């Protein structure tokens, strides 16, 4: 993880630059002006990863980060203003604890995962085998800090407490509970994530047809969007994300979602009846009356075949972490769909990265 340049006084200008950049990328498609959703200026990041750096000539170690492209010049940290208050509260207490050799010996990396609800999980990574002595020390530390702990060494993983954190997010007046597993993707900026969920919920609107969701992850968007439609068919290929999504659906008593572990390409083959899939044996695809598709693809965007799948739908709700590939995908879809809404979500203040959303509707 590289270190963002933290400068709250520059926030407004940086956000305006992102807005102009997004508007410029979408201008060829006659997009409306983007709705802009700001981030808190500090303490917005719910997860953080630090290397440990040893001072030359002694055993003292520090949290360290690096500038982009420079892995040899550490920036030593005592706190981290962009990280959640919970992470900042835990950093010095964990640092004091690694003086115990059972916890600190050959510890080289620390990962924090927290939630708006106040839950926390710390992952400790080692260049040595961890054993029962580590577990005993970790159980004591977890109780003292009020956290869950995961220890990792080559070929071994020990969990103290839970291997996930519990989050609560509010969308349109309803609270949704989420399990967010250690090591799996979660949106880093909780406040902005909540705004994204609200925007997607509003943009989709109340429908009497069905929704197809690609790349559903742990069900971040699935839960609120399922309340807007008759049924949802959701796909995801990550096993840990699928398991988390299934648990989240059960925890929230959402019973109109079927989740299958298929790639977008495999689902396209299934919908085209090119080949059967055993994982779809209990799902009657012909029973769905899809009106909308929701996509939240990786940075590479949708491949051309997935774009052609999306083209079948009246409405395409697209959340993107890369505006360049978003624009490329829209260029492929523009002859059949127009942009009726777009939004900028400032998930990553003080960086050039941005999250954006568009609603495309059939012409």
Curated annotation (Swiss-Prot):
GO biological process annotation, one example: tRNA methylation
Protein name stated in the entry: tRNA/tmRNA (uracil-C(5))-methyltransferase
Keyword S-adenosyl-L-methionine included in the entry's annotation: yes
Keywords recorded for this protein, A-Z: Methyltransferase, S-adenosyl-L-methionine, Transferase, tRNA processing
The protein's role, per its UniProt record: Dual-specificity methyltransferase that catalyzes the formation of 5-methyluridine at position 54 (m5U54) in all tRNAs, and that of position 341 (m5U341) in tmRNA (transfer-mRNA).
GO cellular component, one term: cytosol
Lineage: Bacteria, Pseudomonadati, Pseudomonadota, Gammaproteobacteria, Pseudomonadales
EC numbers: 2.1.1.-, 2.1.1.35
Gene name, Swiss-Prot/TrEMBL: trmA
Domain of life: Bacteria
Organism of provenance: Pseudomonas aeruginosa (strain ATCC 15692 / DSM 22644 / CIP 104116 / JCM 14847 / LMG 12228 / 1C / PRS 101 / PAO1)
Catalytic activity: uridine(54) in tRNA + S-adenosyl-L-methionine = 5-methyluridine(54) in tRNA + S-adenosyl-L-homocysteine + H(+); uridine(341) in tmRNA + S-adenosyl-L-methionine = 5-methyluridine(341) in tmRNA + S-adenosyl-L-homocysteine + H(+)
Tagged with keyword Ribonucleoprotein: no
HAMAP family, A to Z: RNA_methyltr_TrmA
InterPro entries named among the record's database cross-references: MeTrfase_TrmA_AS, MeTrfase_TrmA_CS, SAM-dependent_MTases_sf, TrmA_MeTrfase, U5_MeTrfase_fam
Binding site for S-adenosyl-L-methionine: 187, 215, 220, 236, 296
Recorded GO MF terms: rRNA binding; tRNA (uracil(54)-C5)-methyltransferase activity, S-adenosyl methionine-dependent; tRNA binding
NCBIfam families: trmA_only
Catalytic residues (positions): 321 (nucleophile), 355 (proton acceptor)
Cysteines paired by S-S bonds: none
């Amino acid at each position: 993880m590289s270190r963002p340049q933290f400068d709250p006084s520059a926030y407004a200008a940086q956000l305006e630059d992102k807005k102009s950049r997004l508007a410029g990328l979408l201008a060829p498609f006659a997009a409306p002006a983007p709705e802009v959703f700001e981030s808190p200026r500090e303490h917005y990041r719910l997860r953080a990863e630090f290397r440990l750096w040893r001072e030359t000539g002694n055993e003292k170690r520090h949290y360290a980060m690096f500038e982009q492209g420079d892995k040899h010049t550490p920036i030593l940290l005592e706190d981290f203003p962009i990280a959640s208050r919970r992470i900042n509260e835990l950093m010095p207490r964990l640092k004091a604890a690694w003086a115990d050799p059972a916890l600190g010996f050959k510890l080289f990396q620390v990962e924090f995962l927290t939630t708006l609800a106040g839950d926390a999980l710390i992952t400790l990574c080692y260049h040595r085998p961890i054993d029962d002595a580590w577990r005993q020390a970790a159980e004591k530390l977890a109780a003292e800090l009020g956290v869950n702990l995961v220890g990792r060494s080559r070929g071994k993983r020990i969990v103290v407490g839970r291997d996930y954190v519990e989050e609560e997010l509010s969308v349109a007046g309803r609270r949704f509970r989420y399990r967010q597993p250690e090591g799996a993707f979660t949106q880093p900026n909780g406040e902005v994530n909540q705004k994204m969920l609200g925007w997607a919920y509003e943009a989709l609107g109340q429908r009497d047809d069905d929704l197809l969701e690609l790349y559903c992850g742990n069900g971040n968007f699935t839960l609120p969007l399922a309340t807007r439609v008759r049924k949802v068919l959701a796909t995801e290929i990550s096993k840990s994300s699928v398991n988390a999504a299934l648990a989240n659906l059960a925890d929230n008593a959402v019973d109109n979602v079927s989740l299958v572990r298929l790639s977008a390409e495999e689902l396209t083959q299934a919908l085209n009846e090119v080949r059967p899939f055993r994982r779809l044996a209990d799902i009657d695809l012909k029973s769905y009356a899809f009106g909308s598709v929701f996509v939240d693809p990786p940075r590479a965007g949708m491949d051309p075949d997935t774009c052609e799948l999306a083209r079948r739908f009246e409405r395409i709700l697209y959340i993107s972490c890369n505006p360049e590939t978003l624009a490329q995908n829209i260029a492929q879809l523009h002859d059949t769909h127009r942009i009726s809404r777009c939004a900028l979500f400032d998930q990553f203040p003080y960086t050039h990265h941005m999250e954006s959303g568009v609603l495309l509707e059939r012409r």
